């Protein structure tokens, strides 16, 4: 089955072609980072308008790269949520219109299920069951995965997601958008031990997260440094390192607890923050000590992309899942509501 995947949940337009027998044939992505940088964050209306502008040219590009024509496509998968409603509607309406014109089915895909299954596109994919850490700008969740659509939520953030905390902390220190990569870049030049931040909710049992207090601690530390006359690049680097260490250690501690609770030794990390090198190193060491395995997607598939949507959609379409031509998207959509395959 040849599936065209469309991703428009936020600020990246992703298109890909996935074949159930030949694998990923082509993918293309346009990031709106430069468009939103001047505003310090994503502007929903601008995001939607840019998706409209980019979608069809990217589809043509992917078809050309794969050497395919529309008549060869068996189905279209598109992100139906969660995400920005306006942005989601661009992808959904495009997918349904093309599906109607080409006489093929279209299927809405859960954005975070796409992220969760992205490591399946690698040469050594994880086997079910496993524990997944979904960590991005909008989500921080620990999920027990027994199969596609068989998800048990083990823990999640009570406030800010980890990626959101990265971005907000970076913005408070006057760093460029997006803040996560900026924090990671500065942390590489930071001096360890100059600052120490709390590991939120690690002093109590359970698998819930909270990053708003950590963000406030970083803000207070930065303001105190500025008040003392030190707003140097090195001060930013040292705070960035301490902040990143706190987030990484918190995520690592919770992942270890989740694995023990589930009785598993396989961990999948997915979402934009999973590209963070310090997080990967920490989790690899933890799984190594447990004699377990950790899996993640290649860096370009950690952030939003069409390939993960095409793959996730293909799995459900092959299982016989279909939907009507009605255009329906959801800004919020718990993964536990998905039907199992």
Curated annotation (Swiss-Prot):
Bound cofactor: record note: Binds 1 Fe(2+) ion per subunit.
Please give the biological process terms from Gene Ontology that the record holds: tRNA threonylcarbamoyladenosine modification
Q: Report the domain of life of the source organism.
A: Bacteria
> Which residues bind substrate per the record?
134-138, 167, 180, 276
The entry lists its GO molecular-function terms as: iron ion binding; N(6)-L-threonylcarbamoyladenine synthase activity
Keyword flag tRNA processing: yes
Keywords (alphabetical) are:
Acyltransferase, Cytoplasm, Iron, Metal-binding, Transferase, tRNA processing
Per UniProt, subcellular location reads as: Cytoplasm
Can you tell me which residues bind Fe cation? 111, 115, 304
Give the reactions, separated by semicolons, that this protein catalyses.
L-threonylcarbamoyladenylate + adenosine(37) in tRNA = N(6)-L-threonylcarbamoyladenosine(37) in tRNA + AMP + H(+)
**GO CC annotation:** cytoplasm
Required co-factors:
Fe(2+)
Name where it mostly resides.
Answer: cytoplasm
Q: Which family does it belong to?
A: Belongs to the KAE1 / TsaD family.
What role does it play? Answer: Required for the formation of a threonylcarbamoyl group on adenosine at position 37 (t(6)A37) in tRNAs that read codons beginning with adenine. Is involved in the transfer of the threonylcarbamoyl moiety of threonylcarbamoyl-AMP (TC-AMP) to the N6 group of A37, together with TsaE and TsaB. TsaD likely plays a direct catalytic role in this reaction.
Q: What is this protein called?
A: tRNA N6-adenosine threonylcarbamoyltransferase
């Amino acid at each position: 089955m040849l599936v065209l995947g469309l991703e428009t949940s936020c600020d990246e337009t992703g298109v890909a072609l996935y074949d159930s027998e030949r694998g990923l044939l082509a993918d293309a992505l346009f990031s709106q980072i430069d468009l939103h940088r001047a505003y310090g964050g994503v502007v929903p209306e601008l995001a939607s308008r840019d998706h409209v502008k980019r979608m069809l040219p990217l589809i043509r590009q992917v078809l050309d790269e794969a050497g395919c024509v529309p008549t060869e496509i068996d189905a279209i998968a598109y992100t139906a949520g969660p995400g920005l409603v306006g942005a989601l509607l661009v992808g959904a309406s495009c997918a349904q219109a093309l599906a109607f014109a080409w006489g093929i089915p279209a299927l809405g895909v859960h954005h975070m299920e796409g992220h969760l299954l992205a490591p399946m596109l690698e040469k050594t994919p994880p086997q079910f069951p496993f524990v997944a850490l979904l960590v991005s700008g909008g989500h921080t969740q620990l999920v027990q995965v027994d199969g596609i659509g068989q998800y048990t939520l083990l823990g999640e953030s009570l406030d800010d997601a980890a990626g959101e905390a990265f971005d907000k902390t970076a913005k408070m220190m006057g760093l460029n958008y997006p803040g996560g990569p900026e924090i990671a870049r500065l942390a590489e030049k930071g001096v360890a031990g100059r600052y120490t931040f709390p590991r939120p909710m690690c002093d109590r049992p359970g698998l819930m997260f909270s990053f708003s207090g950590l963000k406030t601690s970083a803000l207070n530390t930065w303001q105190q440094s500025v008040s003392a006359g030190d707003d140097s690049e090195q001060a930013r680097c040292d705070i960035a390192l301490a902040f990143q260490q706190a987030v990484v250690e918190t995520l690592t501690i919770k992942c270890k607890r989740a694995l023990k609770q589930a009785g598993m030794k396989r961990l999948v990390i997915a979402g934009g923050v999973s590209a963070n090198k310090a997080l990967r190193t920490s989790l690899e060491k933890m799984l190594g000590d447990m004699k377990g395995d950790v899996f993640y997607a290649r860096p370009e598939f950690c952030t939003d992309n069409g390939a993960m949507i095409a793959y996730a959609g293909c799995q459900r379409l092959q299982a016989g899942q279909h939907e009507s031509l009605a255009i329906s998207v959801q800004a919020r959509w718990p993964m536990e509501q998905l039907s199992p395959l």
